[in-house]
Every structure is written in C-alpha cells, then in structure tokens.
Amino acid sequence: MGKLQSKHAAAARKRRESPEGDSFVASAYASGRKGAEEAERRARDKQELPNGDPKEGPFREDQCPLQVALPAEKAEGREHPGQLLSADDGERAANREGPRGPGGQRLNIDALQCDVSVEEDDRQEWTFTLYDFDNCGKVTREDMSSLMHTIYEVVDASVNHSSGSSKTLRVKLTVSPEPSSKRKEGPPAGQDREPTRCRMEGELAEEPRVADRRLSAHVRRPSTDPQPCSERGPYCVDENTERRNHYLDLAGIENYTSRFGPGSPPVQAKQEPQGRASHLQARSRSQEPDTHAVHHRRSQVLVEHVVPASEPAARALDTQPRPKGPEKQFLKSPKGSGKPPGVPASSKSGKAFSYYLPAVLPPQAPQDGHHLPQPPPPPYGHKRYRQKGREGHSPLKAPHAQPATVEHEVVRDLPPTPAGEGYAVPVIQRHEHHHHHEHHHHHHHHHFHPS
C-alpha cells in the first residue's frame, strides 16, 4: 500500500525491498562513513613527524577541543547556521588551521573523533503515498498499520546504518492541506507527532518541498478530525447514486432506487391517481356540448392523456369535476380492491376495460356517427333520448355482476411489467374498443332502423 521513494544527494542509491515489495531506501550512511575513514587516514599521515613521538612536549599542553568555524559560503542552504561541518569540510578546515599552531602543531586522532562530530550530509527525501484503490474515501486500520510498518522500517534502517551510534531521530509528521508534509531530524529520541489534519482528496498532486535533513512525506490519514472524512464518504455515494438515477430516468429505465428511494412516492399512490385522472379526464371530455362520438372521444382521451408515473396527479384530481350518479360507481370499479398494490397497468387490464365499457353504457353507443353506413333518420334522435331515459339506471345491473369476475381475471393474468412499458396499452384498448363499439352500433342500428 505505502509506496516509498527516497532520494539521496551525496550518495548513490541502493535498492532495498520491504515487506510491501515496492519501496526504495537510500543508503544514507555510505558517504558519511567513507568520509570519516578517509579523514582518519589523512590525519594519521599528518601525525608522522620527523622529530619523534607526537605526544611529548608542547603537544600535551595544546590538546583542546578543535572547533571549526562555519564559513559564510558553507552556511547557505543549511537548516541550523551554527552546526558543524561534515568530515570532508572539517578536514579541509583543519588543514588550514594546522600550520598556524605553535611550533608546527599536529592533529590528534582522538580529538578528531571525539570533539569534532562527523555529520553526514544526508539529504533525504521520503515520500509516502497512501492510495485509495477502491474509492471508498476512508482509510482502514489495516492500511494505516501497513503504512506505519513501512515508515518504521525505513526510519529504523536510516538510524541503525548511520556512522554515529548515538544518533537519534525525531520525526515530525504533519499532513497539511497541500499534498506535502515534512519530517525533520532533531535531537530527542522517539517520535514526536504534531496533530494531523485530515484531508480526503481524490487527486494526489505531489509537490514535496525538498530541504536539508528534511524528509518530505505525504500521508492521507484521518486521526484527529474524523468528521469531514465521515461526511465525505456518504456524500460521494449519494452524488453517484443521484447521477445514476438521473441518467436512468432520462433513458426511461425503471430502477429500484428511483421507484423506492426517499424522494419518490409509493407506487400504489402514483398509479391509482393515474387511473382516476384518466377516467376523470374522459368524464370531463364527455360532458362537452358536442355530444357526438362519446365512445370514440373517451378512447382518444385514454390514449392521449396517460399521466406519467413520475408526475403527481394531484392537480388533475383537483381541477377535474367529480363524477355524479351511476357513473361514479362505474369509475371506481376498475381500480377495485382486488388489484394488488404496486402492479402497473397492462394490456389485460385494457382488455377488461374494453369488455364492459360498452356493456355499461349501451345507450351512448348509437351516438357515434363516424362508423354509420348512412346517416340516421331524424326520428332516431327522439327515440334515442326516450331510450336513454328508460335505461338510465339499468346499466348498473351489469357492473355489479361483471366487475368481480373481470377483476379476478385481471389479478390472475396480470404480468408484472414496469409502468414504462404500459404505454402500448391504450393502443390495444382503442382497437378492441372500436371493434366492440361497431358491434354494438350495428346491433342498435338494426334494432332501431325499422321504426
């Protein structure tokens, strides 16, 4: 998980495999150890003087800690201006100071080892990146344990392979809003961590700021501020779900979340107002002053005014007039209690409507003049109104006998098709309605024509 890359300014890079298998560790101790050994060898060469043992005479009194002043040009780019030089710089400064000593002063190797601290010029840069492969937006305990194990191995290798045995390391870990963090080396032992800030970002644009003795690390980690992290995860899921539902709705595909989501009304509440709105619309259209072709007009209304399932039908129910008299019971009968909730309309329900629509309103069938072979005679209208007055209450007998069996047939044969596929229903209904309408028309025409 944690991918580690490290750079070294003064030493060559050496590959080292960690348990993660994909980490690089620089050999930070190579140049320091080589410089120290070379400085010791040159110091021994300088101690070989022709006048004998270097530990007699003025050299015993002149043993003192050798302090090397830091030149101005060497202090550039250093983090601490008062720090001591590395082994090579200390050797060059000692060579400059050596001849100035009283009576040809020689260097002591003990003073060089003890009083002049040989520091490595280990410019190290470590970058730890925690990837989010599953796009969950959260860092698990296993991810953090793997990352900290990798960091521990890298820091342990850097400390144990150093030339100085008493070298300690202070780790300062900060996760800043920018995708870059800093690790500093300092005196106290152990790990001193500042409070980290959580930054859950999708992109990882790494711009580590490189400095001397500073390890740059980028770790995505929730520790002290988990609230933005916990809010980020569900927000991503909701956003993706909304986008998916939006495109599915545009394509006309029925999906589970759009039908039963928190923002959608129940299916039964949507479909029952749909049927009632279409019937009420047919009722209002049939009450227009032009009383011809009521059956044909009703079938056209059922075709043209199909209310979509996603649109609430409350406005249609409020604006349409309430049905009165015998047709009120008829209009309520198609959506009877036998219909299962959530089952959308289909072609079988359209057939059921077409079967007993003409049976309920037989006197209105002769009003359609579009399919007559010849126009009806004038007395036909008077008998039509008398027949309508006589048979005004008779159609109620047929719906009481028929709707029970018809609705059971609808419940039994109704396939569970989505509401989006039910737009072919009114076409079949219109065709069969015309068929039965013509049958009734011819029957009534031959019945009334001799008179």
Swiss-Prot record:
Keyword Cell membrane set for record: yes
Chief place where the protein resides: membrane
Annotated region (Interaction with TGFA), positions in chain: 300-385
Tissue and organ distribution: Expressed in kidney, lung, pancreas and spleen.
Residue numbers spanned by region Interaction with DVL1, DVL2 and DVL3: 113-178
Free-text description of this protein's post-translational modifications in UniProt: Ubiquitinated, leading to rapid proteasomal degradation. Interaction with TGFA interferes with RNF25 binding and protects against ubiquitination mediated by RNF25.
Cellular component aspect of the GO annotation: basolateral plasma membrane; cell periphery; cytoplasm; cytoplasmic vesicle; exocytic vesicle; lateral plasma membrane; plasma membrane
Residue ranges annotated for the EF-hand domain, each copy included: 119-154
GO molecular function, one term: ATPase binding
Subcellular location: Cell membrane; Cytoplasm; Cytoplasmic vesicle
Region feature Disordered, mapped onto this chain: 1-108, 162-237, 256-408
Record keywords, A-Z: Calcium, Cell membrane, Cytoplasm, Cytoplasmic vesicle, Exocytosis, Lipoprotein, Membrane, Metal-binding, Myristate, Transport, Ubl conjugation, Wnt signaling pathway
Compositionally biased intervals (Basic and acidic residues): 34-63, 89-99, 180-215
Key word Ribonucleoprotein present: no
GO biological process: exocytosis; Golgi vesicle fusion to target membrane; negative regulation of canonical Wnt signaling pathway; negative regulation of Wnt signaling pathway; positive regulation of proteasomal ubiquitin-dependent protein catabolic process; positive regulation of protein localization to plasma membrane; positive regulation of protein processing; protein localization to plasma membrane
Domain observations: The N-terminal domain comprising the first 217 amino acid residues is mostly unstructured.
Protein family according to the UniProt entry: Belongs to the NKD family.
Subunit organization: Interacts with DVL1, DVL2, DVL3 and PPP2R3A. Interacts with RNF25 and TGFA (via cytoplasmic domain).
PANTHER family (UniProt xref): PROTEIN NAKED CUTICLE (PTHR22611), PROTEIN NAKED CUTICLE HOMOLOG 2 (PTHR22611:SF1)
Identification of the protein by name: Protein naked cuticle homolog 2
Organism: Homo sapiens
Gene that specifies this protein: NKD2
